[in-house]
């Protein structure tokens, strides 16, 4: 499951650029123009509607804290509209400018890379404790920081993760209702469709987002309700099996993932601690659970590139012993990968294992989105770092020590990367050691 980190700071008031919207024939995104059509505007409005009604499950009188980049303003304005129509008492939006973030790397003093605006993230955490919902709009440039010093990037990520942790803990424990949705942006579109003109690339990316988010359907809310029921049924089936481990086999992969004691499989929406039902990731095609942090053995190879905090990591290959990564390689971004797993001890261990059929709509699109929210829903994946306590029986009532005793991992990070394909087989291992097929050639057995 994608758990969006706080954006690298570069906050503006939303007036740093003129962004025309609504009655005009074109929307000016940060760089370049995208031609609107009535059909596009209708789908954009549907996306905003399902983000609020289905993704967030917003309650009457609830506040909303939203984060996004400047490029996402055409979508965020519609989300704000639907949030107020749904009864929001206040919507507060924090907009970040990616180009401002780059200026920090080019002109900021060395000490700045160990700093993060704790006051801002503490305020977000306080808002969540006071009952606010959280909505993140993703669409960042996958390679924004690819040319910057990996050591500085790592320091910024660590400082941000530490400062954001009080808020992130409320999110990973599902104490609040939250969701992540996507907005096509020029930089992201160029990365996905490098050979197309900018306007065509944006149109193609928007089309893919609408389809994956079911905003291209006449009644997207009903479509999501049906899809959500299917994911819950799959999770129920896996919970009934009570596997003690999963065994992944495929090219470059022979990995046994032990599952945490009293683990639960989840999929689709969930009821947060505040009683609101939400779908945290839009889109979502996964069912997932918590591995045992000390019971992972073998080696595994990534099947898709990972876009991590503005840098690309490709062809990841790691080896686990007693749950811990003891060897890690990558054909590109190896230094970034190494620094990521050195964030803390938990960064070398798994916090999530997820099953996704190769025939999922996102995989069937044939696109490499270079965005974890989408790519993780095209393939089975694992996540390094923080576990979700909700994937344990009564996990939301357990102390940190009790969670650890059951095998749940603890870390500043939670980074998903893809290991599934149409050449991956997955077996379920029972407590007695018996094995049975769960997936064959990337599909449910």
Predicted stretch roles:
Residues 21-297, 437, 444:
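Active-site bordering "gate/hinge" segments
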Residues 71-72, 140-142, 185, 253, ...:
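Short, glycine-/Ser/Thr-/acidic-enriched flexible segments
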């Amino acid at each position: 499951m994608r758990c969006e980190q706080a954006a690298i700071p570069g906050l503006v008031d939303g007036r740093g650029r003129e962004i025309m919207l609504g009655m005009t024939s074109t929307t000016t995104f940060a760089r370049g123009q995208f031609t609107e059509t009535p059909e596009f505007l209708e789908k954009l409005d549907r996306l905003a509607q399902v983000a609020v009604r289905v993704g967030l499950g917003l309650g009457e009188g609830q506040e909303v804290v939203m984060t996004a980049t400047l490029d996402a303003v055409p979508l965020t304005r519609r989300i704000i509209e639907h949030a107020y129509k749904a009864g929001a008492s206040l919507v507060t939006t924090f907009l970040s400018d990616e180009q401002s973030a780059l200026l920090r790397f080019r002109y900021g003093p060395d000490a700045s890379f160990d700093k993060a605006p704790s006051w801002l993230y503490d305020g977000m955490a306080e808002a969540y404790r006071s009952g606010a919902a959280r909505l993140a709009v993703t669409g960042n440039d996958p390679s924004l920081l690819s040319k910057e010093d990996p050591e500085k990037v790592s320091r910024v990520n660590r400082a941000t993760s530490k400062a954001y942790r009080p808020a992130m803990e409320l999110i990973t424990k599902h104490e609040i209702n939250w969701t992540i949705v996507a907005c096509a942006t020029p930089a992201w579109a160029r990365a996905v469709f490098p050979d197309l003109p900018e306007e065509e690339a944006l149109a193609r990316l928007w089309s893919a987002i609408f389809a994956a988010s079911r905003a291209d359907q006449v009644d997207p809310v009903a479509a999501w309700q049906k899809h959500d029921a299917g994911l819950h049924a799959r999770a129920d089936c896996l919970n009934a099996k009570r596997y003690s481990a999963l065994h992944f086999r495929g090219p470059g992969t022979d990995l046994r993932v032990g599952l945490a004691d009293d683990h639960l499989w989840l999929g689709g929406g969930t009821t947060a601690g505040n009683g609101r039902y939400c779908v945290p990731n839009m889109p979502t095609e996964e069912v997932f659970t918590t591995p045992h942090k000390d019971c992972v053995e073998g080696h595994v190879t990534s099947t898709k590139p990972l876009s991590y905090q503005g840098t690309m990591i490709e062809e990841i290959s790691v080896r686990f012993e007693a749950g811990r990564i003891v060897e890690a390689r990558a054909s590109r971004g190896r230094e970034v990968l190494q620094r990521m797993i050195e964030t803390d001890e938990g960064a070398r261990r798994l916090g999530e294992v997820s099953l996704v059929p190769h025939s999922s709509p996102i995989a069937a699109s044939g696109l490499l989105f270079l965005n974890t929210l989408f790519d993780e829903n095209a393939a089975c994946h694992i996540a390094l770092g923080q576990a979700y306590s909700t994937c344990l029986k009564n996990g939301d009532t357990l102390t940190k020590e009790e969670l650890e005793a059951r095998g749940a991992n603890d870390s500043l990070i939670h980074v998903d990367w893809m290991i599934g394909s149409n050449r991956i087989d997955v077996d379920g291992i029972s407590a007695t050691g018996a094995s049975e097929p769960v997936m064959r050639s990337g599909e449910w057995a």
